[in-house]
């Protein structure tokens, strides 16, 4: 895994390597064509971008250099922003990240959806393989189990909830305030809903070119995206949260407007939606997603995190067991079949002496064969679950010498 995230890179650096869904699909296909790579998945969110590959052990090509080539940037300039993980380290990272434990806001839910969508995008483009497919399915299933069994005691666990919470601590008030939310996607709807719950007068932008009825959160007003600047000076808060690679607000669009009262712009997107230069204008304050951080973890949460740790360790062990023994299934099937044939040969003389209709003898022989096959398979898979992978491999080698 090659990744860049909020821990090692600024928002300016992260946005260089972010991908829209269409861009990610194109890059997936390019990487999958590289000799030695069996599968590829790209995860691109507001806080991180990760390239996951399943490859042969002898594969030595740098994924980082491939990525820089695709993005047309100097591979020496951003190397410090990236981290590479492999083996157990990569597995552990994916499991904990999918649960939201590596997010800026611990336990946030959106990352689970984003990981699932990353897997689905790879599937749609035939870029995954059995190893990545199984790894991501294990991580997603584990995260669902965690969220079902353990409810983290984090107030305002989603991004917008945390943003509102932090702003309240800074004495910002929302009740009765006019808010413009640019973007009616998942994050935009979450933002609009939360602000409406806070008692704000919320307006949401919608695109004219979209066909059919466009749903917006209950209690909110709507305007066409193209009209977003007409009354922007009247708002107290302007939140932009789109997945577009293009900015929604440029300095040049605001420079001729007169902001008579303070307006807080909040940019929740990566790449950024709002031109950072707008802070040059009077009465304008801009916060991007890096401004909001979680500072403390409660004792109750620490206990819950230990419980989550136990669940994830168990699930990771299950995946590792599958990975280490994924080539053993055919061996077990062969050994079980050969053992069943051996049993059949050993009871053949006895079967011939039994006074029984030939059809019944054939049925009995088939039943014995099937039962032997199942019993031997059960014994071997049971053994696998109670010894180390190395010991199990040794046992398989020994049994292959017998059958």
Curated annotation (Swiss-Prot):
Active site: 46 (nucleophile)
Gene3D superfamilies, per the entry: Glutamyl-tRNA reductase, N-terminal domain (3.30.460.30), NAD(P)-binding Rossmann-like Domain (3.40.50.720)
Functional pathway: Porphyrin-containing compound metabolism; protoporphyrin-IX biosynthesis; 5-aminolevulinate from L-glutamyl-tRNA(Glu): step 1/2
GO molecular function annotation: glutamyl-tRNA reductase activity; NADP binding
Site (Important for activity): 93
EC annotation from Swiss-Prot or TrEMBL: 1.2.1.70
Sorted UniProt keywords: NADP, Oxidoreductase, Porphyrin biosynthesis
GO biological processes: protoporphyrinogen IX biosynthetic process from glutamate
Binding site for substrate: 45-48, 103, 108-110, 114
InterPro entries associated with the record: 4pyrrol_synth_GluRdtase, 4pyrrol_synth_GluRdtase_dimer, 4pyrrol_synth_GluRdtase_N, GluRdtase_dimer_dom_sf, GluRdtase_N_sf, NAD(P)-bd_dom_sf, Shikm_DH/Glu-tRNA_Rdtase
Source organism superkingdom: Bacteria
Coiled-coil residue windows: none
Annotated catalysed reactions: (S)-4-amino-5-oxopentanoate + tRNA(Glu) + NADP(+) = L-glutamyl-tRNA(Glu) + NADPH + H(+)
Pfam families named among the record's database cross-references: GlutR_dimer (PF00745), GlutR_N (PF05201), Shikimate_DH (PF01488)
Residues annotated as binding NADP(+): 183-188
Function: Catalyzes the NADPH-dependent reduction of glutamyl-tRNA(Glu) to glutamate 1-semialdehyde (GSA).
Family (UniProt): Belongs to the glutamyl-tRNA reductase family.
Assembly description: Homodimer.
Additional record remark: During catalysis, the active site Cys acts as a nucleophile attacking the alpha-carbonyl group of tRNA-bound glutamate with the formation of a thioester intermediate between enzyme and glutamate, and the concomitant release of tRNA(Glu). The thioester intermediate is finally reduced by direct hydride transfer from NADPH, to form the product GSA.
Alphabetical list of PANTHER family matching this protein: GLUTAMYL-TRNA REDUCTASE
Record remark: domains: Possesses an unusual extended V-shaped dimeric structure with each monomer consisting of three distinct domains arranged along a curved 'spinal' alpha-helix. The N-terminal catalytic domain specifically recognizes the glutamate moiety of the substrate. The second domain is the NADPH-binding domain, and the third C-terminal domain is responsible for dimerization.
Protein name per its UniProtKB record: Glutamyl-tRNA reductase 1
Gene source species: Lachnoclostridium phytofermentans (strain ATCC 700394 / DSM 18823 / ISDg)
């Amino acid at each position: 895994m090659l990744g860049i995230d909020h821990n090692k890179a600024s928002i300016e650096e992260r946005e260089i390597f972010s991908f829209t869904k269409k861009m990610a699909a194109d890059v997936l296909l390019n990487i999958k064509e590289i000799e030695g790579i069996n599968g590829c998945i790209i995860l691109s969110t507001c806080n991180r971008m990760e390239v996951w590959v399943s490859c042969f052990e002898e594969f030595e090509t740098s994924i980082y250099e491939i990525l820089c080539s695709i993005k047309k940037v100097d591979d020496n300039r951003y190397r410090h922003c990236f981290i590479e993980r492999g083996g157990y380290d990569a597995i552990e990272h994916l499991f904990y990240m999918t649960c939201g434990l590596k997010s800026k806001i611990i336990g946030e839910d959106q990352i689970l959806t984003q990981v699932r969508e990353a897997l689905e995008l790879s599937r749609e483009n035939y870029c995954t393989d059995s190893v990545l497919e199984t790894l991501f399915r294990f991580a997603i299933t584990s995260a669902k189990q965690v969220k079902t069994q353990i409810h983290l005691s984090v107030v305002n666990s989603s991004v917008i909830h945390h943003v509102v919470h932090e702003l309240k601590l800074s004495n910002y008030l929302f009740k009765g305030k006019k808010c413009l939310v640019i973007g009616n996607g998942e994050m935009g709807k979450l933002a609009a809903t939360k602000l409406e719950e806070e008692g704000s007068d919320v307006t949401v932008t919608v695109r004219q070119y979209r066909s059919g009825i466009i749903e917006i959160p209950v209690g909110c007003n709507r305007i066409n995206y193209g009209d977003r600047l007409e009354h922007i000076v009247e708002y107290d808060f302007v939140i932009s949260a789109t997945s577009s690679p293009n900015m929604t607000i440029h300095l040049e669009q605001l420079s001729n407007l007169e902001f008579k009262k303070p307006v807080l712009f909040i940019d929740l997107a990566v790449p950024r939606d709002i031109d950072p230069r707008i802070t040059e204008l009077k009465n304008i304050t801009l916060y991007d997603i890096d401004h909001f951080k979680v500072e403390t973890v409660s004792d109750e949460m620490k206990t819950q995190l230990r419980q989550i740790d136990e669940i994830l360790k168990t699930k990771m062990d299950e995946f590792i067991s599958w990975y280490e023994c994924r080539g053993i299934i055919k061996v077990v099937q062969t050994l079980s079949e050969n053992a069943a044939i051996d049993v059949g040969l050993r009871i053949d003389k006895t079967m011939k002496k039994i006074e029984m209709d030939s059809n019944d003898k054939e049925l009995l022989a088939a039943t014995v064969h099937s039962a032997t096959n199942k019993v031997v398979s059960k014994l071997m898979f049971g053994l696998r679950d109670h010894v180390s992978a190395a010991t199990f491999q040794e046992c398989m080698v020994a049994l292959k010498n017998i059958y």
